[in-house]
Amino acid sequence: MGQEQDTPWILSTGHISTQKRQDGQQTPKLEHRNSTRLMGHCQKTMNQVVMPKQIVYWKQWLSLRNPILVFLKTRVLKRWRLFSKHE
């Protein structure tokens, strides 16, 4: 166990804590002190990848004064154009 404590993973994430099983044996816990922080970091990294698309969508959404009316207007115009072509 002395060698395990020298590994960078254990030094960077903190100490290994143990838990007692029902039969009385102690086993190392899988989670670390900083596991929550690590998960948050992973989520932030993933969000940074998706963020530019979201910004574009939000800018488009905010540029519309009333999104429902704009949607209906474009839908009616498309149908009108299709109807006009068939006549």
Swiss-Prot record:
One BP term from GO: symbiont-mediated perturbation of host apoptosis
Subcellular compartments: Host mitochondrion inner membrane; Host nucleus; Host cytoplasm, Host cytosol
InterPro entries according to UniProt: Flu_proapoptotic_PB1-F2
Site positions (Low pathogenicity): 66
Any Pfam family hit: PB1-F2
Bias type Polar residues, positions: 14-28
Alphabetized UniProt keyword annotations: Apoptosis, Host cytoplasm, Host membrane, Host mitochondrion, Host mitochondrion inner membrane, Host nucleus, Host-virus interaction, Inhibition of host innate immune response by virus, Inhibition of host MAVS by virus, Inhibition of host RLR pathway by virus, Membrane, Modulation of host cell apoptosis by virus, Viral immunoevasion
UniProt keyword Nucleotide-binding, yes or no: no
Region (Disordered): 1-38
Keyword Membrane attached: yes
Region (Mitochondrial targeting sequence): 65-87
Cellular component aspect of the GO annotation: host cell cytosol; host cell mitochondrial inner membrane; host cell nucleus; membrane
Its job: Plays an important role in promoting lung pathology in both primary viral infection and secondary bacterial infection. Promotes alteration of mitochondrial morphology, dissipation of mitochondrial membrane potential, and cell death. Alternatively, inhibits the production of interferon in the infected cell at the level of host mitochondrial antiviral signaling MAVS. Its level of expression differs greatly depending on which cell type is infected, in a manner that is independent of the levels of expression of other viral proteins. Monocytic cells are more affected than epithelial cells.
Oligomer status and interactors: Oligomer. Interacts with human SLC25A6/ANT3 and VDAC1. Interacts with host MAVS.
Other facts noted in the record for this chain: Is not encoded in all strains, and seems to be dispensable for replication.
Family designation: Belongs to the influenza viruses PB1-F2 family.
Name of this chain's protein: Protein PB1-F2
Organism: Influenza A virus (strain A/Puerto Rico/8/1934 H1N1)
Underlying gene: PB1
